[in-house]
Amino acid sequence: MNPFVRTQSVISGLRVSVVAAVLILALLVQLQLFGVRYAYSLSGLIQMFVIWLLSPPATYFYFNSNLDKALILKVAAPLAIAVTAVGLLYTALTGGLLGLELIVLGYLFEPIAGISIFLTLREFSPESYMFIVGAFAYTLGLPLYFFDFGYLAMIGDAVKLSGLLILIRRLSR
């Protein structure tokens, strides 16, 4: 692993990502059980907003970590945060489908931003593959909720969550 990587900052970012992944998994299960309409409910909107609130601190920690290929993160993460914020606001204010589509679009940048984390940690920990594969599966599975088939996103998020937990454990040694 790059000797200039700030391990504690990476661990802090991973911890925030774990909290987000747990909250996302809970939301994904509810969306599968109650349908996409759940995203328009007050509790669904609050859950999505709380998840969104975790993205700036996670991004801050990752920005300060000296990751390899950090430019990928520094471009993709703010795009993800901004597009998702617009989608959340649009969903909350209009209840229109475009809002959810923007949220899904914003989340397409999440695994792209995660490439910097993956490239930094892959030699140190093969479990980083779980993280990145899970992130891509989760993201690619999100549009399937529009067809009442959210299982790929749930499995992807669970794999990503497992990878994050293993990475934290390995880095904390």
Predicted regions and their residues:
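Hydrophobic, aromatic-enriched alpha-helical segments typical of multi-pass transmembrane helices
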Residues: 1-173
